């Protein structure tokens, strides 16, 4: 029998110390990793609930285990809200992550060895879009498209040419590091011309889509996948959506369970249900709009300071900065900004001469900073401070100006104190 007042603190001090230190880091550092965000206390409440105890293999009202009458309600709430939020006819809320949403789509629609056409990782795609180190590149014949070198936007002519040449069974639209608006309809036309399925991975922009700040692909694609964190601000998990197609829906359900997963995580599904409800609130639309405003403001500062912003700006929550001209590595810039308590991630950029472990660029995102209340002016100031730190970096000695970094760190400290994550 458990005492409800039991805590980790006082029982496992090493773990408690690490958790408390991370909580403090999140308050004291500015989070600009594009795939991260802060969830609400309600989402965390669901994830820490007794639902974690319940096994529920199968689907609502079609379980292999008994005692599922209450978790059936939870999962159906999540399904119904996901469909309403994104205008979908079908939703599967069981995937544990974005990658585990993508993999079952491959399983449902393809056979091993089939050809898929996806965005190159080096140009902004995701590992699961055909990278040779991923299941998507190992089990399937992956062909990759990229960006137009002159415009920095998706080269739709190349997509069409590769589709006609290789006749893929599935085309993947979506990205992990692309700052412009994807023309979903253009991808649909290309897919139809070669008889391919169209899968859209909207993991990064799902929150913007939900708020009407980015085009909705759900009724255009055959299948749409997403994570539920990032701009959607829910738990770290996955989701599959689709327009009406009973045959595909049946295949997708079977590919998730029993194909790719066993029992769903009911506490996480409850957290998704909460997040979907939060995303329907008027405040969320205001948030999503501000995310874009802040990203544009930051990208403009970087360009004004002479840095190469890939695609020459942003129309969503993120942008890439290339330091090829400056001869700096993303690894060095990442470390320098980290010392200033600004968290970003190094990222490969088009025509990057460095390895993925080093890179020549960084990815900057405003989903988390906007959640904690950063304004457009805050974002401009922050970008300027970042540029100061980057300007002080010396690649030859792999160092930076400690005084500049210390000055920025103090400014970051003051801004974080004024904009707490959890009050």
Curated annotation (Swiss-Prot):
Binding site for (6S)-5,6,7,8-tetrahydrofolate: 121, 125-127, 355-357
N6-(pyridoxal phosphate)lysine modified-residue sites: 230
GO cellular component terms, semicolon-separated: cytosol
Cofactor(s) of this protein: pyridoxal 5'-phosphate
Domain of life: Bacteria
Classification via Gene3D superfamilies: Aspartate Aminotransferase, domain 1 (3.90.1150.10), Type I PLP-dependent aspartate aminotransferase-like (Major domain) (3.40.640.10)
Keywords tagged on the record: Amino-acid biosynthesis, Cytoplasm, One-carbon metabolism, Pyridoxal phosphate, Transferase
Principal subcellular localization: cytoplasm
Pathway: One-carbon metabolism; tetrahydrofolate interconversion; Amino-acid biosynthesis; glycine biosynthesis; glycine from L-serine: step 1/1
Entry's EC annotation: 2.1.2.1
PROSITE patterns for this protein: SHMT
Subcellular location: Cytoplasm
PANTHER family, alphabetized: SERINE HYDROXYMETHYLTRANSFERASE
Family: Belongs to the SHMT family.
Protein name per Swiss-Prot or TrEMBL: Serine hydroxymethyltransferase
Species in which this protein is naturally found: Hydrogenovibrio crunogenus (strain DSM 25203 / XCL-2) (Thiomicrospira crunogena)
Biological classification of the source: Bacteria, Pseudomonadati, Pseudomonadota, Gammaproteobacteria, Thiotrichales
């Amino acid at each position: 029998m458990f005492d409800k007042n039991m805590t980790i603190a006082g029982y496992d001090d090493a773990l408690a110390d690490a958790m408390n230190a991370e909580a403090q880091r999140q308050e004291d550092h500015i989070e600009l990793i594009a795939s991260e965000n802060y969830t609400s206390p309600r989402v965390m409440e669901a994830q820490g609930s007794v639902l974690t105890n319940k096994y529920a293999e199968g689907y609502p009202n079609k379980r292999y285990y008994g005692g599922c009458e209450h978790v059936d309600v939870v999962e159906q709430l999540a399904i119904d809200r996901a469909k309403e939020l994104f205008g979908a006819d079908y939703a599967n809320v069981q995937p544990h992550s974005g990658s585990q949403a993508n993999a079952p789509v491959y399983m449902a629609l393809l056979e091993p060895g089939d050809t898929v056409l996806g965005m190159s990782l080096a140009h902004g795609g995701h590992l699961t879009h055909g990278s040779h180190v991923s299941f998507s590149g190992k089990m399937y014949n992956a062909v990759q498209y990229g960006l137009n070198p002159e415009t920095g936007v998706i080269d739709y002519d190349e997509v069409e040419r590769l589709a006609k040449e290789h006749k893929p069974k599935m085309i993947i639209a979506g990205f992990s590091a692309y700052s412009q608006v994807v023309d979903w309809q253009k991808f649909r036309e290309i897919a139809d011309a070669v008889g391919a399925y169209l899968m859209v991975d909207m993991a990064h922009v799902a929150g913007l889509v939900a708020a009407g700040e980015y085009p909705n692909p759900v009724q255009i694609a055959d299948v749409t996948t997403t994570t539920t964190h990032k701009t959607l601000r829910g738990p770290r998990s996955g989701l599959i959506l689709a327009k009406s197609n009973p045959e595909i829906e049946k295949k997708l359900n079977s590919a998730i369970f029993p194909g790719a997963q066993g029992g769903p995580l009911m506490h996480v599904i409850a957290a998704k249900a909460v997040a979907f409800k939060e995303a329907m609130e008027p405040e969320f639309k205001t948030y999503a709009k501000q995310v874009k405003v802040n990203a544009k403001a930051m990208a403009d500062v970087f360009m004004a300071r002479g840095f190469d912003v890939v695609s020459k700006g942003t129309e969503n929550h993120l942008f890439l900065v290339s330091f090829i001209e400056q001869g700096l590595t993303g690894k060095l810039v990442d470390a320098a900004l980290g010392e200033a308590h600004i968290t970003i991630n190094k990222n490969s950029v088009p025509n990057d001469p460095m390895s993925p472990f080093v890179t020549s660029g960084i990815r900057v995102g405003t989903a988390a900073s906007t959640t904690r209340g950063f304004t457009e002016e805050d974002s401009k100031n922050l970008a300027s401070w970042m540029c100061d730190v980057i300007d002080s970096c010396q690649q030859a000695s792999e160092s930076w100006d400690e005084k500049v970094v210390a000055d920025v760190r103090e400014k970051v400290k003051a801004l974080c104190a004024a904009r707490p994550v959890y009050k």
